[in-house]
Amino acid sequence: MIEEGGNKRKTMAEKRQLFIEMRAQNFDVIRLSTYRTACKLRFVQKRCNLHLVDIWNMIEAFRDNGLNTLDHSTEISVSRLETVISSIYYQLNKRLPSTHQISVEQSISLLLNFMVAAYDSEGRGKLTVFSVKAMLATMCGGKMLDKLRYIFSQMSDSNGLMMFGKLDQFLKEALKLPTAVFEGPSFGYTEHAVRTCFPQQKKIMLNMFLDTMMADPPPQCLVWLPLMHRLAHVENVFHPVECSYCHCESMMGFRYRCQQCHNYQLCQNCFWRGHASGAHSNQHQMKEHSSWKSPAKKLSHAISKSLGCVPSREPPHPVFPEQPEKPLDLAHLVPPRPLTNMNDTVVSHMSSGVPTPTKRLQYSQDMPNLLADEHALIASYVARLQHCTRVLDSPSRLDEEHRLIARYAARLAAEAGNMTRPPTDASFNFDANKQQRQLIAELENKNREILQEIQRLRLEHEQASQPTPEKAQQNPMLLAELRLLRQRKDELEQRMSALQESRRELMVQLEGLMKLLKAQATGSPHTSPTHGGGRPMPMPVRSTSAGSTPTHGPQDSLSGVGGDVQEAFAQGTRRNLRNDLLVAADSITNTMSSLVKELHSGAEAEEQAGTEKTREGLPPRGTFLSVFLLHTWTKLAGCQTHSTSRERSQAYGKWGGTA
């Protein structure tokens, strides 16, 4: 007893699962009943994965389960309904890729419980065929035009006229869907529902039915049906517009623009819940937008419309013939084949399709004639299909095609079973059949080997794509080491950039100093180089490309430096920083030696000038220049980070000896 009670509670929980999930979505806060109903049914459609099945797949499932041969009032059990639903989802999984497979068992359970709750409220355990077709055709995915055409085919007679009794029955079944999601007070069935759809028309054809159902606005009792399709179309539409109430930067889905307030726009969540701010009111007329157009596109469209360049709007649906097509004449195409003996007459069909009796000839002469007759029959069948412009329009046409194919297959089987071959060709046919069997066996073996190879490669690929535990343990260490190496590389690049920048600044200073020395040497040979004459020391100009990359050559770092320094340092682009600094040190040493000689030659004049400057409180110019030169040499010696102590001692010795 306890186990039975637990099973009953589990079954009830499964039946109520879809409704519990729907209540969790909080659709009841939507103010307008039309949007509330459409949102609920759209949720049921997506939760049951019916949006992945179009109307043509539904028709195929109906035929596979024999529902097309049953009368609309025939009742089927819940177990047979479960079989129909199972075939729908299993066929769906065959069409979907392996990465998008659905849970078939869960989808079957959700849809079955929803249909039973909607259409078997009395608990009889039976549903009519028309109820199943109406519900699945309404809730499946695909185009609304295709749905309405199929629904009209179920409600029309052989002359293509809609029967109002069938329409009333369809509305009764279709309006059970809003009632199932607790929207019965707004969209429940009434006896006057048919006349609200077609108030004056007496003869309703297909085009008139489509015009009424796809009009804007549609019939009031079915206004939620086209809205549910529009919801499916705009779920992923992006609007780069800010909502005037919640101030979100963009919108998804519908966008609503007030026709009275200037530039007042709401997202679908705010509009559905009745939010308003500022001077806007819920009583204002709102325009629904399902797409976004840029201002430039709107302007071009307005100009084209004013100039009459915009083409006329296409009709909402193509115009279909008023008269339904006639069924195929199966007896004319493939007449029944009687079972005959060797001496009986056979019927050969020419391309015209008229049967003519002939005597059976010998086997060698009869086979080509039979093949020619079969080819002519197939050609006439193809020509007949080409002239049929709407083969897939009516569901009855598929039944006739199935019967045609079945009869044609039975005819071929009867010919193959009743036709006896002459003994002269028995050995030849046996050898040919043996060779064909051998060829088939070889092809099957090759196919089996190819499948095994594909399976082996797939396993190898999966094993290679899945990391082993050892690799998983080594990966963090490798990543940490790689991160340290990158950090060290960045530090070295920054250090190299700083050295290059410092070197370039020193070269600019030396260039200015050498220009000053040359100017004083040409003007007054006995005068020491000073900063006199009101000429300021040129300051270094920072290049934007100095710190961008540390891999440029020496010539790049000497851009903007005078010719003397470039000649001293332009010893080849392949030298490294240490060699460039050593060459620079040699050049500076030579320059310093010539400078010191000039200083010694004019010592007396410098002492006298220094005495006068000291009296005036100013430092001697030669002393200032010497200090500046020593400071410059010290900075250059410090830039030689990679030079050896021997090279440094040689450089200092050269400087000291020269001094």
Curated annotation (Swiss-Prot):
Phylogenetic classification of the source organism: Eukaryota, Metazoa, Chordata, Craniata, Vertebrata
UniProtKB keywords: Acetylation, Cell membrane, Cell projection, Coiled coil, Cytoplasm, Membrane, Metal-binding, Nucleus, Phosphoprotein, Synapse, Zinc, Zinc-finger
Tissue: Expressed mainly in liver and lung. Expressed in brain, namely in neurons of the cortex and hippocampus and in the dendrites, soma, and nuclei of pyramidal neurons of the hippocampus region CA1. Expressed in kidney, namely in epithelial cells of renal tubules, collecting ducts, Bowman's capsules and glomeruli. Expressed in blood vessels and pia.
Organism: Mus musculus (Mouse)
Location of the protein in the cell: Cytoplasm; Postsynaptic density; Cell projection, Dendrite; Basal cell membrane
Region described as Disordered: 520-562, 599-620
Zinc fingers (ZZ-type), renumbered ranges: 238-294
Encoding gene per record: Dtnb
GO cellular component, as recorded: basal plasma membrane; cytoplasm; dendrite; GABA-ergic synapse; inhibitory synapse; nucleus; postsynapse; postsynaptic density
Modification Phosphothreonine occurs at: T11, T69, T179, T212, T424
Matching Pfam families: EF-hand_2, EF-hand_3, ZZ
Modified residues (Phosphoserine): S394
Reported function: Scaffolding protein that assembles DMD and SNTA1 molecules to the basal membrane of kidney cells and liver sinusoids. May function as a repressor of the SYN1 promoter through the binding of repressor element-1 (RE-1), in turn regulates SYN1 expression and may be involved in cell proliferation regulation during the early phase of neural differentiation. May be required for proper maturation and function of a subset of inhibitory synapses.
Name of this protein: Dystrobrevin beta
